[in-house]
Amino acid sequence: MIRSLLSFTAIAMLLSACAQTPLRGTGDLGVVVERATGSLQIIESDTHTALARVEGLGDLSHASVVFSRDQRYAYVFGRDGGLSKVDLLSARIDRRIIQGGNSIGGAISQDGKLIAVSNYEPGGVKVFNARTLEQIADIPATLLPDRQKRSRVVGLVDAPGQRFVFSLFDTGEIWSADFSQGPTPRIERFTGIGQQPYDALITPDGRYYMAGLFGEDGMAQLDLWHPERGVKRVLGHYGRGQARLPVYKMPHLEGWAMADRHAFVPAVGHHQVLVMDARRWQPVDAIAVAGQPVFVTARPDGRQLWVNFAYPDNDRVQVIDTQTHAIVADLKPGPAVLHMEFTARGDQMWLSVRDGGEVQVWDPYRLERLATLPAQSPSGIFFSSRAHKPGY
């Protein structure tokens, strides 16, 4: 009897072990935002496959994603103010809150313990515990002259020194929030930086915060190594120019590419990629391209740029050689190419083709398509390797 019971127990334990999900890493995982259905697809780059779909994430029409340091969790910032923590291994929502009424992006702190969200409504930044999503801090933006609303906040990035840096669209400011001493941040405000900063980036070395201006030409630059020097205007010609050309889609400043000591910048309203000396911030060239560029994405080795475009040229992607500035490929993946993402080592390029209802995987060296995955109105593609890139 005892022997039978022990045998039964051993078999049960063995079957239980077999039924468990096998251990795996998350370094080759990512997500595709399905904007029309409020869902994410969890993707695996090694096998060019979609592993699961996570639903119930709200309005993802302008969604962005950051990742925990262990690359297990994706934090999804929805346009409806939703902040969702998604477990990539179990393919489920770990936690979800509604923290505002209209949000435009977020960031994760240098130590991975804080999540910041920038809000249009109510204007400001809220900061949360990355593990529990409990609110840590509320940073209201500057009141507008009517004293009823606060400025909308854009261009939120993480910066070295446990800081978040962001821009105030309506009041023309850049703020830095330093959390290095605890949950009450030290706020540094820079006013009069220019009209209507609409988006921003931080350079890969974490030194310069660059805000694009919608209300005038030029960019506002804050040297985070020397904030006491204040904000200065650079790239005075960058913008729509005196002709005020129609802009079908403002370029994303995350779409700047840094390669070979140059910055490759999507021009505003012009069919050009601008080339800047990244030490002196002076223009050195302008590359003619097929349309108004939205993203200019560098292959991790810096040798190639992949460029997508605003309507009506958003069915095309052009590839530029960063040494010769020549266009080496003119691809037509399909209607409405919205986003592009390289894998961490640059062996694959993933494209979202919204109106084609698919995500494509390309070999960027041979310029050949490797795979196609169905998706529901796909937009942003984000790999978990972003967890270890400042500003991402």
Predicted regions and their residues:
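Bacterial N-terminal signal peptides
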Residues: S7-S16
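Predominantly soluble domains enriched in secretory-pathway, periplasmic, or organellar proteins
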Residues: C18-Y392
